Amino acid sequence: FTTFYREFGSVLKEGLGEDFGNRERILKLLRFSTSNNDAVSTSLQDYKARMPEGQKAIYYVTADSLNAAKNSPQLELFKKKGIEVLLMADRVDEWAMEFVHEFDGTPMQNVAKGAVDLGDLQDAEEKKALEAAAEQFKPVVEKLSDSLKAKTKEVRVTTRLVDSPACLVTGEGELSPQLIRMLQQAGQAVPESKPILEINPEHPLVRKLENSAQFDDLANVIFDQAVIAEGGLPD
């Protein structure tokens, strides 16, 4: 099966968008790398069996390469908490997952889309800390939003980051950079889309913004670093 999957895994994934009647069967055949294991060997059944008590979703991230997926800043909080994340680096993954919202009754959640919510896996103290940081950094966020309004849809404080100053996320219901690139390469027209910039209030570079005389320059450095970590943005 491993040899077969290496050759035809991408074809199987295409079936998620083309063969609705067999979607559940196809999902059971898929195999993924994870943040705990580089080998393309984990099924969705395996992942669910390893989920800790309190985890309410199957978490995954898409990227242009396995290395990019493994080093995605969006994984930092999950790694810190020891939560396994599926790594999807096949070109067809982002498109295929648009047709998958749950597996065996458990929601599928792209960790790079929307606000991060770990539910019971995130304690009340962490949620309070985020609220306090959001209030403290409100002036910085407003200033950043204005400085980067041509590049971002929104700027907000997040708890998903541990080591990185910032990351880019896609709004709920919007197309990801990977999917936009894929559609553009296929010659399809794509609506204009801007990413959401999330900042880490604990990072020294972000804290430096509070009293920086070169605010706009520093804001652009932070944004550009987030773009590089994302593997670039579509044209």
State where each predicted segment sits:
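Conserved GHKL (Bergerat-fold) ATPase module
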Residues: 1-235
